[in-house]
């Protein structure tokens, strides 16, 4: 039945770079990103941009869902297939999406020092 949620988030790439360069890098990466995301982003020359875009994507999805209690960062994995980003969900994120009959559409971008993500939630079958 049309659009059911919209989320937008921006993330400072330099902020993520400072975290990656600092003593909190490992705890941050372990808490926020799945192993697959870390493997993909960590081998890129623009790792901070890749991490920032995924951070923004996860924040945007949480906003689109209305910040359901119990959702965890690793419940939301950002993947790419054929160039288009999408979510592979688990845990509370998956439970909420299935209970509400939703599917998510994700757009990512970055320029200069900013990464941004937009998430549109739509009822399945629309």
UniProtKB/Swiss-Prot annotation:
It comes from the Bacteria. Its cofactor is Mg(2+). One of its GO terms (biological process) is fatty acid biosynthetic process. InterPro entries: 4-PPantetheinyl_Trfase_dom, 4-PPantetheinyl_Trfase_dom_sf, ACPS, Ppantetheine-prot_Trfase_dom. It catalyses: apo-[ACP] + CoA = holo-[ACP] + adenosine 3',5'-bisphosphate + H(+). One of its GO terms (cellular component) is cytoplasm. One of its GO terms (molecular function) is magnesium ion binding. Keywords: Cytoplasm, Fatty acid biosynthesis, Fatty acid metabolism, Lipid biosynthesis, Lipid metabolism, Magnesium, Metal-binding, Transferase. Mg(2+) binds at residues 9, 59. It is found in: Cytoplasm. Its main location: cytoplasm. It holds the Pfam family ACPS. Its EC number is 2.7.8.7. Transfers the 4'-phosphopantetheine moiety from coenzyme A to a Ser of acyl-carrier-protein. Belongs to the P-Pant transferase superfamily. AcpS family. NCBIfam families: acpS (TIGR00516), pantethn_trn (TIGR00556). This is Holo-[acyl-carrier-protein] synthase. It comes from Myxococcus xanthus (strain DK1622). The lineage of its organism: Bacteria, Pseudomonadati, Myxococcota, Myxococcia, Myxococcales. The gene is acpS.
